[in-house]
């Protein structure tokens, strides 16, 4: 197998990263592709009480176990199968369940801090930042957290104003400068997605 191509897709919460990723995956049908979500790598918090876990700031870079993510990517690139962790949001700690990933032609790493860590960026062949208006991002986050995570609207808005927005401005927005391409308006930008697909295909064939 040729060298594994690693793609990083970053952007704020609700920016449309998942939509962009889904369309790139669809365009790459016929290739062997794996999607690894950075959210899988929230740190294990078994050593903390449940009350302490409730205070976790999931929008801070320190919440992620990037060392494990980097090691998993290196192993996959070297042809090894890896066990990727998963996260239990109800208990605010790592789940006992893992997901088995085998080496692929392309690995997509998607997450709000996908471009924040320099050692992680160094593994990437293509770095993408999805840039979407803040008003649209908060609306998407409200819908997601209420429907998928059982949150109330009040709690989501409070978290956005006190944590998500400040963390975005401090840590996520600045990573835009590391991107090879910035995709405005997420998955609706078919031109940018097609350009990125063509670039990825060219890397696979090298």
Swiss-Prot record:
Source organism superkingdom: Bacteria
Write out the GO cellular component annotations: cytoplasm
Record keywords: ATP-binding, Cytoplasm, Kinase, Nucleotide-binding, Transferase
The cross-references to Gene3D superfamilies, in alphabetical order and at most eight, read: P-loop containing nucleotide triphosphate hydrolases
Q: Where does ATP bind?
A: 11-18
Q: What is this protein called?
A: Uridine kinase
Pfam families reported for this sequence? PRK
Q: Name one GO biological process term.
A: CTP salvage
The record's InterPro entries line, in alphabetical order, gives: P-loop_NTPase (IPR027417), PRK/URK (IPR006083), Uridine_kinase (IPR026008), Uridine_kinase-like (IPR000764)
Q: What class of enzyme is it?
A: transferase
List the taxonomic lineage.
Answer: Bacteria, Bacillati, Bacillota, Bacilli, Bacillales
Spell out the molecular function terms from Gene Ontology: ATP binding; cytidine kinase activity; uridine kinase activity
């Amino acid at each position: 197998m040729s060298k594994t191509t690693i793609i990083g897709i970053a952007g704020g919460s609700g920016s449309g990263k998942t939509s962009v990723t889904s369309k790139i995956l669809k365009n790459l049908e016929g290739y062997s592709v794996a999607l690894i979500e950075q959210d899988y790598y929230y740190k294990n918090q078994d050593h903390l009480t449940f009350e302490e876990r409730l205070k976790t700031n999931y929008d801070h870079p320190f919440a992620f176990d990037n060392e494990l993510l980097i090691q998993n990517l290196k192993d996959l690139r070297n042809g090894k199968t890896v066990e990727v962790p998963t996260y239990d949001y109800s208990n605010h700690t790592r789940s006992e369940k893992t997901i088995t990933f085998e080496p692929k032609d392309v690995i997509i790493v998607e997450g709000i801090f996908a471009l924040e860590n320099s050692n992680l960026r160094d593994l990437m062949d293509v770095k993408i930042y999805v840039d979407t208006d803040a008003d649209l991002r908060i609306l998407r986050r409200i819908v997601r957290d209420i429907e998928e995570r059982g949150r109330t609207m009040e709690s989501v808005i409070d978290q956005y104003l006190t944590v998500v927005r400040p963390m975005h401005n401090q840590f996520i927005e600045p990573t835009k400068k590391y991107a090879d391409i910035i995709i405005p308006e997420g998955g609706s930008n078919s031109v940018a997605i097609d350009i990125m697909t063509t670039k990825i295909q060219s890397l696979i064939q090298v």
